[in-house]
């Protein structure tokens, strides 16, 4: 039985005051929520502060990126060992902003996936097509290629306990969102694609939707059978909006 997971990706936003205030408000808004796992991914600078602010709550600490190296002369990087040491659990990799701005390849992202698994951390593998690829009918081809970078090097078993976040690039931060039916079709394709290698693993892998998820569209998205939660950007910076999304996931999956 898959459990829903809603994760907030704070991106390049935050301050000490903001972290303390947002986490305190999240604790209030999410008190009593038990049917949906909740994670937040602040900038690395604020991971320790967020961890202490969330102590004693059900909020799980995550991070936005990881390096493929565990230590050494790699200026500016953060290793899986460091993230594990500070208490982060869910680690985002392959986000379209990393793929675009930092030219991260499918193969490089697959190496990050492997490093996280080796350290006992949970990869949140972001996949998704650009607007041009979508218009060219290449959505499934792109998603399959991005998944295959892991499947072909680590096997289907690598996805056991992992998370995939389908984020159509054309919907991130644009206000556009795939319709629930469109998102469900891609999520089903992703699950079926993994099932070709291992049906049992495919059935349990959590597949989140990410792409302008907000308080108004969350409930309908979560009624879809293969949408197991959300990776939330802008709305995760507002406790009330984020809480609506979490509660929508909880309600939909308990129905």
UniProtKB/Swiss-Prot annotation:
Domain of life according to the entry: Bacteria
Q: Which UniProt keywords apply?
A: Cytoplasm, Gluconeogenesis, Glycolysis, Isomerase
Q: What is its EC number?
A: 5.3.1.1
Binding positions (substrate): 9-11, 173, 212, 233-234
What family classification does the UniProt entry report for this protein? Belongs to the triosephosphate isomerase family.
Role summary: Involved in the gluconeogenesis. Catalyzes stereospecifically the conversion of dihydroxyacetone phosphate (DHAP) to D-glyceraldehyde-3-phosphate (G3P).
Q: What is this protein called?
A: Triosephosphate isomerase
């Amino acid at each position: 039985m898959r459990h829903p997971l809603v994760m907030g990706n704070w991106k390049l936003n935050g301050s000490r005051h903001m972290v303390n205030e947002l986490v305190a408000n999240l604790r209030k808004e999410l008190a009593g929520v038990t049917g949906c796992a909740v994670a937040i991914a602040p900038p690395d600078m604020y991971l320790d502060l967020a961890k202490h602010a969330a102590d004693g709550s059900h909020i799980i600490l995550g991070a936005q990126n990881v390096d493929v190296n565990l230590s050494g002369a790699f200026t500016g990087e953060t290793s899986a060992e460091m993230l594990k040491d500070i208490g982060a659990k869910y680690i985002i990799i392959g986000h379209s902003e990393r793929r675009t701005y930092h030219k991260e390849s499918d193969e490089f992202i697959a190496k990050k996936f492997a490093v996280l698994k080796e350290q006992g951390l949970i990869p949140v593998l972001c996949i998704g097509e650009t607007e041009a690829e979508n218009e060219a009918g290449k959505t499934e081809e792109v998603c399959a290629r991005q998944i295959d970078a892991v499947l072909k090097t680590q096997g289907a078993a690598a996805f056991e306990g992992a998370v995939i976040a389908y984020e159509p690039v054309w919907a991130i931060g644009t206000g556009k969102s795939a319709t629930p039916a469109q998102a469900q079709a891609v999520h089903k394709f992703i699950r079926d694609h993994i099932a070709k290698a291992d049906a049992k693993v495919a059935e349990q892998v959590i597949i989140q939707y990410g792409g302008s998820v907000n308080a108004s569209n969350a409930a309908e998205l979560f009624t879809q059978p293969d949408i197991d939660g959300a990776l939330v950007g802008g709305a995760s910076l507002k406790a009330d909006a984020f809480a609506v999304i979490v509660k929508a996931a909880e309600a939909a999956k308990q129905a």
